[in-house]
């Protein structure tokens, strides 16, 4: 079983750790976070406002974080090149600070003895992999990879199924996206666009996202054919993608439902879901799929122009894919 280090014990760091423990597919052996001490880690891992109590045991013992009886080494280094991952037995490192997202910055982990680094965010220059879409293109010469974004993980499997069956001429994506940690609780200054700094609980905030363009990196045939934007809305978790696209081959909406369901039951099982129920966002809190197609929410204008809707738990679904990507990479060693 691959031994994993986690850098940054924020939303994704903690949920990747939960996903690792729950799945039993990888073993977390080390965590680095300079801003959270050991006892605080115990508390933050145990209690979660969005995903509830951790259903297991967690405690601090002999300077280590012990989850379900497994001791995890704790580091508190600000500089990733100083983290002694090898000493803790960590072979793969999940880079989940959101700060070290380039090849050069994430590469600092290799100095501490990590063999591979998985960036849990989009990267400007690291190769991006989306499970179920292009993970087969991974080869073991790559030391640093990106698991792309939660939104790309939702959109890409759906876009792949539609493109493989009907051909996407062009498309626009909108993600109606839950609040994330970078937003403000009340109006404040923003480092990027001014409106990004407006109160998250009070507003629907138009925002940029590279998620749709990134699909062109994981599905090269769609490069330049998709772009998109986001609305940040006052919900704590679970987001939804609206893909509006023009199809090359004519298709009835029932044809689209059929091929998506076939993919969800077959090659993309566990990654792409399918539902005909009258669901709302809360119904996907804690869902481990990358994307769940909402058959009842989509609409067709005609046989060539459709709006498709797919839900995702932007925290937990994504964290499960980080684990799956590491398992896949380990199978190629």
UniProtKB/Swiss-Prot annotation:
> Record's SMART domains?
Gp_dh_N
- Subcellular localization, per the record? Cytoplasm, Cytosol; Cytoplasm, Cytoskeleton; Nucleus
Give UniProt keywords alphabetically: Apoptosis, Cytoplasm, Cytoskeleton, Glycolysis, NAD, Nucleus, Oxidoreductase, S-nitrosylation, Transferase
**Recorded catalytic activity of this chain's protein:** D-glyceraldehyde 3-phosphate + phosphate + NAD(+) = (2R)-3-phospho-glyceroyl phosphate + NADH + H(+); S-nitroso-L-cysteinyl-[GAPDH] + L-cysteinyl-[protein] = L-cysteinyl-[GAPDH] + S-nitroso-L-cysteinyl-[protein]
What Gene Ontology terms describe where this protein resides (cellular component)? cytoplasm; cytosol; GAIT complex; lipid droplet; membrane; microtubule cytoskeleton; nuclear membrane; nucleus
Q: Which InterPro entries match?
A: GlycerAld/Erythrose_P_DH (IPR020831), GlycerAld_3-P_DH_AS (IPR020830), GlycerAld_3-P_DH_cat (IPR020829), GlycerAld_3-P_DH_NAD(P)-bd (IPR020828), Glyceraldehyde-3-P_DH_1 (IPR006424), NAD(P)-bd_dom_sf (IPR036291)
Q: What is its EC number?
A: 1.2.1.12, 2.6.99.-
- The protein depicted here goes by the name Glyceraldehyde-3-phosphate dehydrogenase
* Species for this entry: Gallus gallus (Chicken)
Gene from which this protein is expressed: GAPDH
């Amino acid at each position: 079983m691959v031994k994993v280090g986690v850098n940054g014990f924020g939303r994704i760091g903690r949920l990747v750790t939960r996903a690792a423990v729950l799945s039993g597919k990888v073993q977390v052996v080390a965590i680095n976070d300079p801003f959270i001490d050991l006892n605080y880690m115990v508390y933050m891992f145990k209690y979660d406002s969005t995903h509830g109590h951790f259903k297991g045991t967690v405690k601090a013992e002999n300077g280590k974080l012990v989850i379900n009886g497994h001791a995890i080494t704790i580091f508190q280094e600000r500089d990733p090149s100083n983290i002694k991952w090898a000493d803790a037995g960590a072979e793969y490192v999940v880079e989940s600070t959101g700060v070290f997202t380039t090849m050069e910055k994430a590469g600092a982990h290799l100095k501490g003895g990590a063999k591979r680094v998985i960036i849990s965010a989009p990267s400007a220059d690291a190769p991006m992999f989306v499970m179920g879409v292009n993970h087969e293109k991974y080869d073991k010469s790559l030391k640093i990879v990106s698991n792309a974004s939660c939104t790309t993980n939702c959109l890409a499997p759906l876009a792949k199924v539609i493109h493989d069956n009907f051909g996407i001429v062009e498309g626009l994506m909108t993600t109606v996206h839950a609040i994330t940690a970078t937003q403000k609780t009340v109006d404040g200054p923003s480092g990027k666009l001014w409106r990004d700094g407006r109160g998250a609980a009070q507003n629907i905030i138009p925002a940029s996202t590279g998620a749709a363009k990134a699909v062109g990196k994981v599905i090269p045939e769609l490069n330049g054919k998709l772009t998109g934007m986001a609305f940040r809305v006052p919900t704590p978790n679970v987001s939804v993608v609206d893909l509006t696209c023009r199809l090359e081959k004519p298709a009835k909406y029932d044809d689209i439902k059929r091929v998506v369901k076939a993919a969800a039951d077959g090659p993309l099982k566990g990654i792409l879901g399918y539902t005909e129920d009258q669901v709302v966002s809360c119904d996907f809190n804690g869902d481990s799929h990358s994307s769940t197609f909402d058959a009842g929410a989509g609409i067709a204008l005609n046989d060539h122009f459709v709006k498709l809707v797919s839900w995702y738990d932007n925290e937990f679904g994504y964290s499960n894919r980080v684990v799956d990507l590491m398992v896949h990479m380990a199978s190629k060693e």
